[in-house]
Structure formats: C-alpha cells, structure tokens
A protein has these predicted regions:
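ATP-dependent carboxylate/acyl-activation modules
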Residues: 1-270
C-alpha cells in the first residue's frame, strides 16, 4: 500500500527483548513506548514539511570589502558593507568635531567596555542645535571620555533585535526577538540556524509571543515586517559566511518603521 509501518511496544524496556534486538538487527527497529513513537512521527512530519518548503534563494551578501573594525562604529560599518540598513554615524574625539549637518541628532559614548550605554548616561537624544550638541559632548566627555558617536535621530517604530552566538558544536545560532531597553525583561526571542531566507525569518517572527505588537496598536501604523525579515535573512548569510571570524554579534535595537527598518546599535566580538 506504500504506507509506512512502525514497530511499537507499549511495555517499557521492550527494546532489550530478544525479538526486539533481532528485529532491529534486520533493519526493523522497535520503538520503546507509544510516547516516543508519537514524538518520532511528529519529527518526521516536521521534516517532511521542511523539505517541501520553497523559500527561494538565499540573499546574496558580498563580504569581499567588509572588515571587522573596533567598537560600535566598526560593527555598524561591517553591517552596512554587507547591505544591511544602518544609521550613518560620525565618530568624534574632540569638541571641535562635535557638529552635524542636520538636526536633531543623538550623541552616544564610544568609550570601550560600555555595553549598556543608557545605564551610564551615555546616550543623549533629540539634540536640536550645535550649541546643545557641544554642551552634551562636554558633559559626556567629563564623565565617560572623549570617544563618541553622532547619528541622526531615527523615526519611531517597534524595537527588535538580532544576535548570533557561536556554539562549539552547532556553529552560529541566530537570535530574533523584541529588543530595546526591555529586551532582557521581555525575553521574547526565537532561535534559528543560519543561513536562511526571509520567508523562514517570517516564520520565526510569527512564533514570538508579542508578535501582535508589529501589527500596530492604538492608532500606530503596522511595522514593516517584510523589511525586518529581509534584514534578518541578509544578516544570517553574513554570519554564516564569517562564522570562523566572529564569535558574537548583538544588534539592538533594529527599529522597524512603517516602511523599512534601521539598525541603530551593534556590537561585534571577533
């Protein structure tokens, strides 16, 4: 009939019986317990569905000119060189350089060793003039040192995050979830093995507990999930390509707008 057949024993420990051992040796393994059998069937169906997916080709990412530079500026440049949507930043280390072509801007410390800039007063938002920028830079320099970054303010949106950790056995494992200052509190993330397509990234996003937040709440427009998934897929190809050179990457937040998304902060551990 072409239907698959499984040998299942309802009694625990049956796998040690002579008939079970001989059957297994002949290529017909006996599954020990109905629960184990059902889990196995579920896994087989999941694998069947996985093989049946036609997500299309992976994004093309050219890393021939990409370089892993120091600090946040270096991380953002690596992502920008790989085609990801990154906010432009200007590094400064003296007051005379603390100027911008357009306002409002954000000023962030670039002092080494500070992972959470907001916790130490290392981020000043909505700076509206050159005078305000100089005052903010003077204050930040006095507390945290002269290294800083200036970037244009980015439109509001839903704050998401992307990350990767390299497991010694499985290689890079990518994280997708809700980000921003509440990332560690929400802990709403899913994991995926790179590389993958935007369609797979969308399936990951749909598994998040707070997925509905991306659909717009109380009059706010829906977020551009497609743009975020495109960025996640491109990021997955990047980290898979550089798997032997990068141990960790944290991108938080990725601000997902009504149209498009923007990476505003990143850290690379090579």
């Amino acid at each position: 009939s072409g239907k698959p057949v499984a040998l299942v024993a309802a009694r625990q420990g049956t796998g040690h019986d002579d008939i079970a051992v001989s059957s297994t040796a002949e290529g017909f393994p006996v599954l020990d317990g109905v629960s184990a059998f059902l889990r196995g069937v579920r896994a087989l169906f999941d694998y069947r569905d996985f093989l049946a997916r036609h997500d299309g080709p992976l994004p093309t990412v050219d890393v021939s000119t990409a370089a892993i530079g120091p600090g946040e500026a270096g991380a953002l440049q690596l992502l920008a060189d790989s085609g990801l949507p990154v906010v432009p930043v200007t590094p400064v280390n003296k007051e005379t350089d603390a100027v911008a072509d357009q306002y409002p801007v954000v000023l962030k410390t670039a002092a080494p060793g500070i992972a959470h800039k907001s916790d130490v007063g290392g981020v000043v938002l909505n700076i509206g003039s050159e005078q305000e920028l100089r005052v903010a830079y003077q204050d930040m320099t006095g507390r945290l040192g002269p290294e800083a970054l200036i970037a244009p303010m980015v439109d509001d949106g839903v704050e998401m995050m992307l990350g990767v950790r390299t497991d010694p056995q499985f290689g890079p494992v990518l994280l997708i979830g809700f980000g921003g200052v509440y990332a560690e509190t929400l802990k709403d993330v899913v994991f995926a093995v790179p590389p993958f397509t935007a369609a797979h990234a969308r399936r990951c996003v749909d598994r998040l507990r707070l997925r509905h937040m991306l659909d717009g709440q109380r009059g706010t427009p829906p977020a551009d999930i497609g743009a975020f998934c495109d960025a996640a897929a491109r990021f997955s190809v990047l980290v898979d390509t550089l798997r032997d050179e990068i141990r960790e990457i944290d991108i938080n937040p990725v601000i997902v707008h009504e149209t498009g998304c923007t990476i505003v902060d990143a850290l690379v551990v090579a």
